[in-house]
Amino acid sequence: MDLISVILISIGLSMDAFAVSITNGAMISKVTASEGIRIGLFFGGFQALMPLIGWSIGIKFESYIAALDHWIALILLSIIGGKMIYDSVKENQDHKDEIACDYAAGEKKCLNNKTLILLAIATSIDALAVGVSFAFLKVSIINTIIIIGSITFVICFIGVMIGKKCGKLLKKRAEILGGVVLILIGVKIFIQHTNILSYIF
């Protein structure tokens, strides 16, 4: 597989993570470069790790993974997205959700590592399936995952910064929008993998 193909695959795989990163940047009250780097590292790291796992598993479990990846993505994204929507509209603020933390200047929202891991896994499921195909293609897996991880990191960092600008306009609605975006991404992955629209139209 040539370098251009690997780069195009990397960009394609990072699009869901890019959309989520924009949402994260809009949702977080205090967005800094270090926060963008942290989010980028999580998404880039898992986007690189998943193909490696898929490559290791190989062709033996290809059909099994293809049958479940869309369900895993749909369930994870729907749960996280639904929780974000619920937490943004509930009246009782005594119990803060897991994506809230305190800054010295006051209470600000940020994404904790647990939430980022779940988001990173959910948006890198496709990369796991692609990694399986790498097992029987002539690719340098180490070089490939480095490229995938690096491109995803850069794209997600940019996404967070874009979200930071949008967040000034979205304000309190950012979390609701974020939840909707996550659910829609999950539905999109599900539709793409099941071809359900072909049965309707």
UniProtKB/Swiss-Prot annotation:
The lineage of its organism: Bacteria, Bacillati, Bacillota, Clostridia, Eubacteriales. Keywords: Cell membrane, Ion transport, Manganese, Membrane, Transmembrane, Transmembrane helix, Transport. The chain crosses the membrane at residues 3-23, 39-59, 65-85, 116-136, 141-161, 176-196. It is found in: Cell membrane. One of its GO terms (biological process) is intracellular manganese ion homeostasis. InterPro entries: MFS_trans_sf, Mntp/YtaF, Put_MntP. It comes from the Bacteria. Belongs to the MntP (TC 9.B.29) family. SUPFAM superfamilies: MFS general substrate transporter. The keyword Manganese applies. This is Putative manganese efflux pump MntP 2. Pfam families: Mntp. It is a multi-pass membrane protein. Signal peptide: none annotated. HAMAP family: MntP_pump. GO terms for cellular component: plasma membrane. The gene is mntP2. GO terms for molecular function: manganese ion transmembrane transporter activity. Probably functions as a manganese efflux pump.
